[in-house]
Structures are given as C-alpha cells and as structure tokens.
Amino acid sequence: MAALQSPKTSSRRSKGDGDGDTRDVILGKYTKIEEIGRGSFATVYQGIHNKYRSCVAIKAVNISSLNPKLKDNLKLEIEILKGLQHPHIVALIDCDESTSCIHLVMEYCALGDLSLFIRKRDTLSKHELTRDMIAKYPNPPAGGLNEVIVRHFLKQLASALQFLRTKDLIHRDLKPQNLLLNPPPSTYAKGLLRIVPYKTREDSFTPLVGVESLPMLKIADFGFARSLPATSLAETLCGSPLYMAPEILRYEKYDAKADLWSVGTVLFEMVVGKSPFRAGNHVDLLRKIEQGEDNIRFPIQTEASPPLKKLIRSLLKRNPVERLSFKDFFESSVVKGNIPGLVDEDLQAQRERDSRLAAHAARRDSLPSRTSDGKLEDRPPSSASSPRPPPSNFTRPATSPAVRHVGSRENPDLQRVAVKARKASVASVTGSPSKEELRDHNAKGPVTEQPGPTSPAKERATTRKNSSDQRIDDILDSERERAAQDVAFERDYVVVEKRAVEVNAFADELAASPRFQQQQQQQLIPKQAGAIVRRATTTATPQLSSSPRDAMSRAVATAYNRPRTGSTHNRHNSYDRRYGPSPTSATSAISKALNKASGRLFGVSFSPPLALTKAGRSPPIGYNAFPAYPLAEGNLAVVGDGAKIQPPLDEDTKVLHIIEEIATRSDVVYGFAEVKYKQLAPLTPSMQADTAIKPVVSPEVVDTPEANDTGLTVDAIFTLSEEALVLYVKALSLLAKSMDIAGAWWARKNRGETIGNSPNVNVGCRVNNVVQWVRNRFNEVLQKAEYSRLKLLDAQRQLPYDHAHHASQVGRVSVGALAHSSDQVVISSGITAEKLMYDRALEMSRTAAINELTGEDLPGCEIAYMTAIRMLEAVLDSDEDHQLSGERAGEAANTVSNEENGEVNGLQGEDREIVAKLVASIRIRLTALKKKIALMTKRTSAPAMVSPARTPACQPPAASPVVPQASSR
C-alpha cells in the first residue's frame, strides 16, 4: 500500500546497501530494483527507466516449464497486448527475455490493488496520498468504501470493459487483486512523489471518466492467462474462485457475461467490505450460490443507494441469460449518470471537464474522417465515457497472422482451454463496411454513375475498391477459419482440463469433509499409520504440488525418473493389507514377473530387447511395479477361489470394494506402463546407486542430444512411447471411473439417501483414502502421458520419411483427445492398450505356470496370477460403464458383453469371451496354488520360507493350465 519505496532512497542501490544479496539488475533500458509482489507464475519488481528516471513495474514470468513453441506464442500475445492502449488498462510497455524469464515491463501503480485499498480502509486517512480523499468522502463506519468512491471506480472499470468489448475480448479473471490503483494526477503536480510513473502516452494517467481528484483504476493481468500453461479455467479454479461466475464453476461453456458476474462481486465487496459468497473451495462456493437463489442480501448498516443495490443484484444472477447485458450495464444510471454527493470542488471540476469534452466532440463531428478503406465518413458523437480509439500502429488480434497460431496445429499447449469469446463478424473488428454493405454499395453504384470515358483517377478508385473488397473477403475467410479452429480447439482440450479439475475438486471436497477428518483423527490414536494427507506430494518431486494447475502446467514437458521403493511405505500407510510376506518381497516378485515377460509379446519384441539397446537393462533399476495400491482386508474375494463364503455386505462396503477394485486395476495398468516409461527415461548411473533420488527432466533438456542418449534406437523409442501412451490413457480412464463411482456415492450421501447401514464406521474414511490416492495417481499419470506424447512426437520426426511409422503414412489411428493436439499424435494401427495388456497377462500367467510346475518362487507365482487377473479385468472394463455406479459398475467390469458381435474398447464379442475364459482358468490355477502354499506352510516347521528344492516332494505337481491363444484382433 505504500506509495513508492525507492524515492526515499537512491534510485540505484549499491551492493553493500544493507540488503546483502539484493542487487539492482539492469534489463536493457530498465533497472530492476526490489520485489513488490509475487504470484503463481511471476514475481513483480519495482523498476526504473534508465533514461527518463521514471518508475515501471517489471513482471518476471518463469519460462523454465515452457517449451520453445509456447515461448513463441507468449511473445506473439505480448506484442498484441502492447496495442491495448487505454487509460484504465495497465499498459504493457516493453518485454525483455533472458534464459529463464521473460520480463514484462508495465505501468507502475503506486497505490497497490483494490483489495488492499478495501482492507486498509480505516488507515487511508493517515496516508499522504489518500488523506485528502478521505477528508472529502469518508468511509462509512461499517462496510466498505464511500459510495462516491465506489461509483467512481465503477465508471472507470466500465470504461475499460467497454473498450475490451469493442475488441471482442474478455478478461476472465476480474477481481480486486487485478484492479490496480494510481494516485490522481494532482498528486504529481503537488510533488508528493519524487519519481513519477513512466507514461506510454500523455494521457496514460489522465482518467477518462470519474472524478479527477480520486485515485485512478486500471485493469491488470489482462490476456496473459490465455498464453501461459495450465491457466485459464484451471488456474482460476485453483487460485481465487470467489469472483468466478457460476457457469464457470459448473464447468459450462461461458461467454463475456462471466465478466459481468465478476464486476458484481467486486462491486459488492467495495460496498460491503467482503465478497458476497465465501467458501473454502469452489465446490462449496457453487453450493452457496445455488442455495442463495439470486437473493443478494446487504447488511443493515450498509450505506448504499437503492440504484446501486439494484445494479449489483442484476449482475449477480446465476443464469447468464437473466444477468444484465453489457448494453444495459453501460447504459445504466449508475454507470452513465452523474455521481451524487460530490463536493463543490469536484462538482465544479466535473462540469468544466464535461464542457471541454462537449466542445471537443462538436469540433470533431464537424470534420469528416477517413475509414480504413480510404473513404470519408461522418463519425457519430462519442460520450465522455466512450473509449479512446487505439493508436494507428495497433495490431488487431482478429486480423494478425500471428494470432492464427492460437488454436491451430502449431500451438503445442495440450492443457489450454479456449475460453475467449470471439465473433466472426468483421464489421465490429475493423470498423470497415461489411461485405453485404459493400455489395449493396456496388449494386447501387452503376445506377447513379454517368457513362463516360474512364479517367485515370476513376481507374485508381476502382482498383482501390476492388482491393478493399478482396481484403474484406480475406479477412472474413480468416475469421471463419479461426472461429472453426477455436471451436475445435476448445472441444478437444476442455475434456482433459475439465476432468483434471473435477478429479482434484472432488478430492478436495472429500478431504475437507468434517466427518472424514474426525474419523481420521480417531484412527490416529490407536494406530501410528494415519490416513493419507490431503494434497500429499507423492506423484512427483517434493517441490511440486499435485494441484490441477501444477499438474497440467508441468505435463507439457516434465517427467519424473523416480524409483518407488522409498515411496511405497509413505504413500500407503493408511492400509494394512499387503501381498506376500513383506512389502518388498511382493513388489520384487511381481517386478520380476513383469520384467521376464517384457521381451516376449506378440512373438516379437515390442518392448526393445537388449539387442536394440546400446547399454542398460530393461526395465531399469528402481522400479517397483506392484502393488503400489495395496487393498484393504477382504478385498481379495474377487480374485479368490470362491469357496470361502463372504458375509453379506452393506451397500456402502460394496461401493468401497468396487472403487478399490477399479483403482487396483488401474494400478496394474500403471505398472505395465511404467515398464515402458522407465526405459524412455532411465536412471543415470549415479542415481542408480541411490534409489531415493528423484530426477526431474526439464522441458528444455528433453530435446537435447544428451537427454535422448538412452541407448535406444529411434524405432525402439517410437514403440515404447506409443505403448506407454496408450497404457497411460487406459490407466486414466480407470482412475476416472473409480472417481465417478465415488462421486455418485458421495452425492447420494449428501442428498441424505440411506445407502446402507454400515457397521464399519471407517468405510467413509477408506473411501476418502482411495479418492486421495486416485487424485495423486491421476495427476502423475497425466504428467507421464504428456511426456510419452512428446517423446513419441520427437521419435516420429526422427524417423525416415518413407518409414512405415512416419506420421505422413496411412493406416494410423489417433489416440482420443490427446491426438487432437497441435502436434498431431498418431498411434500405429493395431496398437491398443487392451491388446498389450492381454498379451502381457497371457505371458505372465504362462511364466507363473512354468515356475509353479518347477516349484520356483511360489509366492511370486501367486502375485503373478493375481496381477494377470487384474490386468484382464481391466481389459474387460468398458469405458461405457463410467456412468454406472455401485455394484452395477463392478459387475460390468467382470462380465462379458451381451452383444456377441458388438465391439467394446476394440474387443469383439468372441474376443471378450476368450478373455473371460482366460480369467476363469487363471482363477483355477490361483486357487490350486493357494491350497498348495497353505499345505506346504502347514507341513513345514519354519513358516517363513520353504526351500524350492523340497517343493516337488511336498506337493505333487499340478496339471499344466489351459491357456487360450490370443485371437487376431
């Protein structure tokens, strides 16, 4: 809130000026002095223009997580924003790029933001820059700001929004923190600031509307969220949802009217002193908005006029259709009319300014002006609140070739959600006559034109007219193409973004539930191993969070080479059950089974064998495949022998078991994908010695020759990448399905429906634990899927043009939503997750059967059988079952489709029958193996271990399992 810090000291600070490490940094024409703010993606510093000795704000945007294409798109957007010159919008002055940051030089606003202004309302009378304002317009004893100040800020905010509407732009993140304040122009004349802000124009700090003696409002942070990764909808949801429109909170498509809701919330906070709806997360916020039913109540002590309250209520309508339109908002008496309650001094100044503006408008109306095509026209008079025209060098986003990269195939941002409202009509964009008007004009022209010889001047005029028509046609075609691209772009990417946000939002809601928190606290008393902590950063390195913003922003080019040995105990200490005699033996055995089967798929090696590699092993050291998700007691009934009669379960417990079953299947698929992934991003020799190291592959290192020198050929990298990608996508679908079932269960709980009389009070807590695990795993898989996609694209570019797997060749299919990214992702024909999983399960069951016959590693055989069953259950799992809930979803995953010839997830009816028979045969083998192990354990005096050499003597060998052959799909 303090005005300026540097004027009290020197404009340049020496190295030994008390701040130790704090030093001035010269950035071209500017000097960065000290930090004045910090956000999610950037740090704001106060700076000085070296030549003019005026203040600027330098915003350092961290670009370490951006690949080169995203950097180029950001630069293009910045160049466009330089043309948005308006007194009530913080101007982008300059841009300077370093190796790790892009420094955005912007106008400096000395009074901070509006949220700080409201919070410090009681101390404004003591500040030298606001003392006179409070003396004239004191704030009410209770509530927010004086209504004169509120209306003054509203007029300036409306002026900026009206300017943005002429450009078909929406801000999408209006909130008090993004509304910056500058002292009135009289402050500089009085010399209260020794260093004045840098001006991009003479009228940069001259208000268009409002009272000249009051602070000047400017909209900040406009447009940058559209270009930065993992922003837009996702960042806003995670950042400050208090000012978001309900249609955004409902994940619906929204238009420019979302800004009007934000204006209503900001206006309410200025009047009352707090936001109209307050909640801990956006789920509770939406619930409060819906429960309010558009009944906006003001505290009794609020000093606000009825017109102002009416305007706020008309803006805070849940339904965008019922919400006040922009036209009515700009024409409302509160925005357009005079401000009541002005003191005589300001009232006289207001009248003088209105007279000057009226005289200026009259002179301007008397002069003709030229349109963009060279014709003369008369401009209508503009009101005092109308925005000033942009400078002649302003680059229109709608017609700039650079902007056409947004939403096109050249834009590589996978996670962006296109939410900017654009119009295909070019009339409002360019100010030129529309195509229909030109046709009418051309049709009427020959009627009034007298025949005669064509003069050179007339020929030039005709040429200009034809060129203008051609230019209009080109602009219209460009706009249509761009609109189509944006529609396709939003349709393709909003699914991934929305799903990631929904998963994290539901996990947040469940973790914040008081009933679950109380149960978890009760569990911590008798047991040291408590529940999973909300937002536990188990999916990546400790410095990264698992929020949707971080997960999506780093998914573009970040992957994590981390062993999971050390993380197994920390992640799953909520569960008691683990397969095998110890956690390490189970994971070791199943890892061995996965590794042995990795080179024998389909008769050829889809996972590259050692012959394809220059060095290294497959898979690398440090991989623990299973079980990363241990089940609770009693959940082995699905894979058991069926002879053990289970007690009847209540509905809550059934839902819990179904959720855990699907989550376990997803973990098996994840473990299979990890075998591929670990070969794409192997551990370095120094990291293999210490399995606790979790290296992070930065986006800039991914494309370097050193990072790609993994000992794999290009063909091997291509095969591994596409196999890992389809497996990760399958794991994501299973994780989403388990979350959908949990969400349906939770919704019925909140509606008060009696689902079941569960004798186990910990069922809800266990569901919460599963949901938190699924959330963390979902974010991790999303990151690794994006890394696999980038590796696949890189391998495609390195393949020869005539190679069968080159992107230009035919016979390829896409991989769902991921394939519609700007860098087209294509998967080789015949490569599906279901086929990979089927062959892997088949290979594992065969290997386990051989080991069982020879008496080798019987506990490992048991785990291999169970893993194969889980993987085949995942093959039978249908994406169409996602809408099912409760027991129906679990049954759908374990039964064959009734449609004999119908195709589900690429599997024909006969193929599903083969898979079901294979599951049944493996279950029989598992039952026999369990009986054998139980008998051996009973006969031995040492229950810990039985020598493999004595195994055949203790139990006669079982018959070889009947394993059906894979069908040609």
Curated annotation (Swiss-Prot):
Residues 1-23, 351-471, 563-587, 880-907, 941-969 are annotated as: Disordered. SMART domains: S_TKc. Residues 30-335 form the Protein kinase domain. SUPFAM superfamilies: Protein kinase-like (PK-like). The keyword Endoplasmic reticulum does not apply. Residues 960-969 have a biased composition (Low complexity). ATP binds at I36, G37, R38, G39, S40, F41, A42, T43, V44, K59. PROSITE patterns: PROTEIN_KINASE_ATP, PROTEIN_KINASE_DOM, PROTEIN_KINASE_ST. Gene3D superfamilies: Phosphorylase Kinase, domain 1, Transferase(Phosphotransferase) domain 1. GO terms for cellular component: autophagosome; cytosol; phagophore assembly site membrane. Keywords: ATP-binding, Autophagy, Cytoplasm, Kinase, Membrane, Nucleotide-binding, Protein transport, Serine/threonine-protein kinase, Transferase, Transport. It is found in: Cytoplasm; Preautophagosomal structure membrane. This is Serine/threonine-protein kinase ATG1. The lineage of its organism: Eukaryota, Fungi, Dikarya, Ascomycota, Pezizomycotina.
